[in-house]
Curated annotation (Swiss-Prot):
Located at the top of the head of the 30S subunit, it contacts several helices of the 16S rRNA. In the 70S ribosome it contacts the 23S rRNA (bridge B1a) and protein L5 of the 50S subunit (bridge B1b), connecting the 2 subunits; these bridges are implicated in subunit movement. Contacts the tRNAs in the A and P-sites. The gene is rpsM. Part of the 30S ribosomal subunit. Forms a loose heterodimer with protein S19. Forms two bridges to the 50S subunit in the 70S ribosome. The lineage of its organism: Bacteria, Bacillati, Bacillota, Bacillota incertae sedis, Caldicellulosiruptorales. One of its GO terms (molecular function) is structural constituent of ribosome. Residues 99-124 are annotated as: Disordered. PROSITE patterns: RIBOSOMAL_S13_1, RIBOSOMAL_S13_2. This is Small ribosomal subunit protein uS13.
Length: 124
């Protein structure tokens, strides 16, 4: 089983698709990695030689931030926005949409499920 950047790649999938299981590597970056390392993208992971796996692993380690390192950088960036109290940071802090979407309706993904507000009636 090929293990790259701390992720076990699925053995039966094509290398091109299997690399996308690594956080920070999508399909276009996967194609770029395989083109630059000279590995056939249509090969299955189980058919890769140890040299090819090592070549891919080294290329990813040298050129990209992936998995934990990338997650940590994203978290640091959000924390920095919150610390400097900019508009985007405040939106993150309040759990609201950051990129200008409407919030009067919708925005349920960021706001979570609705909180029902009850009405108190006078006893008569």
């Amino acid at each position: 089983m090929a293990r790259i950047a701390g992720v076990d790649l699925p053995r039966e999938k094509r290398v091109e698709i299997a690399l996308t299981y690594i956080f920070g590597i999508g399909l276009s970056r996967s194609k770029q990695i395989l083109r630059d390392t000279g590995v056939d993208p249509n090969k299955r992971v189980k058919d890769l030689t140890d040299d090819e796996v090592a070549k891919i692993r080294d290329y990813i380690d040298k050129n990209f931030k992936v998995e934990g390192e990338l997650r940590a950088e994203i978290a640091r960036n959000i924390k920095r926005l919150i610390d400097i109290r900019c508009y985007r940071g405040l939106r993150h802090l309040r759990g609201l949409p950051v990129r200008g979407q409407r919030t009067r309706t919708n925005a349920r993904t960021r706001k979570g499920p609705r909180k029902t507000v009850g009405v108190m009636r006078k006893k008569s």
